């Protein structure tokens, strides 16, 4: 089967089989209880008395349970490609030579038991089916647990290098492909002495070597030098923009809203008036001022709409298009939200619903809100993207980009899975907590 079968079809089939088995098991218990209460089953010594119709009813249900379990055993063969038994993840010597044969045998026993339950409908003798069920239970213990453990301990562990060699090779190949490193090539590069001619031929590149590093110390410097009232710089990212007609490396940060610094901390101030940050702060990465500060530039990009209604530090909600004027960005007279990313409060019912959701009665009582007003929620770009596509994993460091006169946020998304056959589980313990890959996986692609 192709990889898509293991990542998509197999989990669905497993879920359906498990759900059906649990449902039929519950129905069987319910049916037995009903027959006991209605007299179909009379508990008396030396053995219960069961009506013929009741036997048939229960026999069919037990046969169905056995068939479903046989299907589960059959699907388990594919699930073993991600087993954790042996030196590596996936099919190992023990899985291949002990567990797989045992699972196939259990599937056959389950089908045989189902057939005997159906035969009991005619013969009215449950003894063969009961004996088969007992044999099934013994084989499940011996073949599913004892035998594989014995093979692992007595055969594999003393001869692991010989027994597991080909399975380790399969694991390495699958892991490299699952993590996207199977196409990596190595090249040996030898560097000679740097000559004057080489320096003169690469002056432009040398002049653009990054000196301003986007580290925490530089974030503090940007925040101190370029911070505006009610706004702050929380993060810096490297990027490239055209500076004086030449594409240059720059360090860029978003001037985000900081409600802790605003003067008006009333409900209107924090939800209707101070609703956004303002623009970007930039500095060429290869330049410093004589004072030692970055060479800040305000003319690298021209923003028609510098307002940042969404940014990583924003929490809670904001309401726009109200009768209250929002705080304008520097150089602007007014700030009017022109987007449609909010939920319009077009009725009293909607206002009441949001008030209950936020436990905030001001959403109902405020006279500043009208039918054109919008509620902006999930204003953190990562949280917003995660709500939109919960099946993806998103990087914890969105970065701002000036595009078409406004600021947009770019965020990396990953497709991940823990079900790639034969591949080893990735060790994520050394990743930055904000990397977005905080769960068990053995397959990842930076696809989004």
Cite the ranges covered by each PLM segment.
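Soluble extracytoplasmic regions of secretory-pathway and membrane proteins
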Residues: 1-448
């Amino acid at each position: 089967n192709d990889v898509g079968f293991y990542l998509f079809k197999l989990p669905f089939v497993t879920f359906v089989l498990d759900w059906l088995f649990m449902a039929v098991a519950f129905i069987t218990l319910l049916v037995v209880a009903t027959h006991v209460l209605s007299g179909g089953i009379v508990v008396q010594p030396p053995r219960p008395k069961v009506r013929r119709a009741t036997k048939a009813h229960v026999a069919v249900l037990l046969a169905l349970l056995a068939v479903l379990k046989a299907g589960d055993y059959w699907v388990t063969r594919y699930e073993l490609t991600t087993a954790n038994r042996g030196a590596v993840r996936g099919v190992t010597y023990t899985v291949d030579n002990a567990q797989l044969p045992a699972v196939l045998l259990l599937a056959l026993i389950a089908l045989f038991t189902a057939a005997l339950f159906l035969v009991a409908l005619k013969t009215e003798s449950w003894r063969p089916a009961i004996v088969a069920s007992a044999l099934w239970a013994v084989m499940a213990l011996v073949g599913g647990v004892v035998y594989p453990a014995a093979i692992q301990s007595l055969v594999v562990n003393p001869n692991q290098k010989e027994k597991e060699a080909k399975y380790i090779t399969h694991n390495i190949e699958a892991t490299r492909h699952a993590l996207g490193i199977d196409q990596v090539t190595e090249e040996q590069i030898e560097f000679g002495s740097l000559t004057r001619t080489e320096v003169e031929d690469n002056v432009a590149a040398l002049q653009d070597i990054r000196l301003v590093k986007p580290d925490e110390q530089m974030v503090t410097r940007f925040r101190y030098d370029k911070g505006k009232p009610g706004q702050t710089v929380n993060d810096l990212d490297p990027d490239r923009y055209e500076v004086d007609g030449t594409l240059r490396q720059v360090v860029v940060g978003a001037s985000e809203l900081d409600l802790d610094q605003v003067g008006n901390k009333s409900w209107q101030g924090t939800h209707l008036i101070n609703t956004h940050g303002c623009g970007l702060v930039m500095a060429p990465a290869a330049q410093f001022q004589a004072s030692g500060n970055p060479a800040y530039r305000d003319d690298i990009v021209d923003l028609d709409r510098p307002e940042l209604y969404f940014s990583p530090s924003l929490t809670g909600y904001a309401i726009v298009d109200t009768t209250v004027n929002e705080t304008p960005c520097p150089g602007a007279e007014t700030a009017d939200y022109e987007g449609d990313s909010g939920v319009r409060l077009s009725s009293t019912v909607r206002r009441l619903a949001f008030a209950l959701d936020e436990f905030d009665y001001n959403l109902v009582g405020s006279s500043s809100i009208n039918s054109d007003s919008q509620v902006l929620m999930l204003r953190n770009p990562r949280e917003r993207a995660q709500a939109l596509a919960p099946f993806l994993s998103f990087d914890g460091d969105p970065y701002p980009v000036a595009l078409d006169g406004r600021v947009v946020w770019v965020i990396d998304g990953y497709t991940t899975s823990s079900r790639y056959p034969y591949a080893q589980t990735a060790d994520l313990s050394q990743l930055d907590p904000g990397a977005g890959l905080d769960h068990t996986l053995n397959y990842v692609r930076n696809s989004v």
